[in-house]
Amino acid sequence: MFELPQRALEWSRSPIRVILLVGLIVAIWLGNDYGATFDEGRNANKGAAALRTYSGSKDYFELDALPDHGPIYFMFFNITAKAIHSLAPSWPEADGHHFTHSLMFLLTVYCFYRLSLRFMGPRPAWMATILFATQPLLFGNGFINQKDTPFMALFIAALVSGMAAADRLHRRGQPSPGTFLPALLNDLRDAAAYIRTGWSGLSRRRRALLAGILLLLGLLMLDLLWIGLLRGLGESVLAAIYRGAAPPPLQRLFDSVATDAYKTPLEAYLAKYEAFYTEVRLPLLFLLPLVGLVVASRFLPGLGQTWGFDRIFAAEPMLWMSAFLLGATVCVRQLGVFVGGLVSLYLLYRTRLKAIFPLVLYWAAGAAVTYATWPYLWPNPIRRFLESLFFAAQFPPHHTFFEGRWMSSRIAPWYYFPKLAAIELTEPAVLLVLIGTAAALWRLRRDRANWFLYGLLALWVGVPFAGLVFFDMTAYGNIRHLLFTLPALLIVAGIGLEAILQRLRRRWAEWLFMAVVALPGIWALIWLHPYEYIYMNSLVGGVSGAYGRYELDRQCISLREAIEEVNQIAAQGVTVMVLGQISAVVPYARPDLRLIDDREPFRSADYVLSCYWQSTIDLGPEGFETIYKVRRGEAVLTDLWRRLPLAPLPSAEP
């Protein structure tokens, strides 16, 4: 009779479960409050077109900006939004998108907690998780951002699962004890001993066979890297086939495939061969050494164990999960290869030489997932992915509003990210990051056992920051492109939180301190809703002080509130002009309203919606009056203008 309450009590004793349950309830409660971003409709259409490619449609390949990023998450939120709309018809599909984004944010919250446990005890870990989950910047983006929020979620999930896989493989593989470099040298000595022992135990015939195979593989690599004999041989054979002078089997095969070969010049076939050779050359350069290792391990007993060539390593489920998440992360943004690098470093640190084979599986599976979920790559995967990486590294500069002026993202000052992080996180979070940095350095000075974990945190934040400062990595719209670094900063804040909790002797003092830490964020969530992502802290005077100095509602989600006001007051069939993206208004506008953009003259409109960050204008001279402002404090996000009625003509003199 008391089984269910007892289970509920046990469940409630897990703070992260309570946090996630509360988060899910909040997502259901608030999921249909948010406006659409200006690129949400375009990305939803791209996801729908990508889904159709699996049934043979070519629509996706006719869209623009395909090298920017893959559509895996766009496909996912298309599916979930339609399912949510069918379950709750009052929610338009745009609200289904926002609910899906919130689930990705909850995944981030869970993974943040799991990662925090590596740096602090359970109590400060879940307290730090509350601090993370109630950051208005993250909470707001968790509902509206269809690129940076899922990227952050997949990034941290890939890292957490990859580190878990490395720990499991460490326990199974039993690498040499000791610190990293001495243990690595010991593994190398073991490998050399296996090779000497195995070689001496081989018969002369097997030695010759092994040496011949390895020599052949080495010559093939040398040819691919430098000589180019295979490339020239292929061109000669193709030319002979084209002339009809090839050996009969090859000639018959070619004739059966290319029945009208004479209609195509030889140069066209040679160009296709060149493209094919370029496509397979790079994979072969990675594959041939692996084949050599596998062959040598089959001949030399024990060698395979030194580099992880073992079934127990290949059967680790967390490794495959992390590989899937890596592939999905790269598909969302090419920068996802960075998390693969972090996981690889940790796997090497934990298992040393035994990491080689698991890493081959990890990267191969991740590449397969990226390829399978990014149709743009299908015609020429390696070349197109490298082009996409280059495009991302040289992403065109955008204008961003910073410190009261517009500037190119390429010439933003070096302190662009640190300053925005300091004013977009809550005051307690900023203070705790500073305290946590000092506490982490103090810990490392006293005990270097966890230096590698702290080093990963430093790389997580430091590498993107270096990309901004030294390599002109594009960032605009405040720090939304760097949201994925904030979990690392807030883990440092958690370290600071733990350092303070250790000095509090009373449980009530701990709870009071936690309330002081969390309440600024919670209050901002309530006051700013549904525009939490515009949050600025008191260092710049809140959103009122930041207005006119920093970007606030760049995504113009406040257009929803304005069009809903029009829905209530406008007559049937009036014309509404949207200064911005009409797609952000369409899901919420009355069906009878005629929507136009600013390519039409103002005289065509009865109402005008103006989102301030991109169009600060005065429509009074055009015969309009302001009747509604979407605002928080002194910050005006969107203006609603209505055409003034025409003055009556003066009556004629009798």
Positions of predicted regions on the chain:
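Transmembrane-lumen/periplasm boundary regions of multi-pass, lipid-linked membrane glycan transferases
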Residues: N43, L51-G56, H69-M75, I79, ...
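Hydrophobic/aromatic-rich transmembrane helices and adjacent perimembrane loops
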Residues: N141, D148-I156, T329-G341, I423-L432, ...
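C-terminal luminal/periplasmic domains and tails of membrane-associated envelope-modifying transferases
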Residues: T259-Y269, V543-P654
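Membrane-interfacial loop-to-transmembrane alpha-helix junctions, especially the N-terminal start
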Residues: R13-I16, P124, R207-A208, A314-M318, ...
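Loop-to-helix entry region of an early transmembrane alpha helix in multi-pass inner-membrane enzymes
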Residues: P71, M75, I79, L87-Y110, ...
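Transmembrane-helix motifs of polytopic, lipid-linked glycan transferases
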Residues: F99-F119, A157, S161, V295-R298
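Short helix- or helix-capping micro-motifs
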Residues: A128-A133, G140, V160, L326, ...
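Transmembrane-helix signature of polytopic, membrane-embedded enzymes
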Residues: S14-V18, W91, F112-T134, Q305-P317, ...
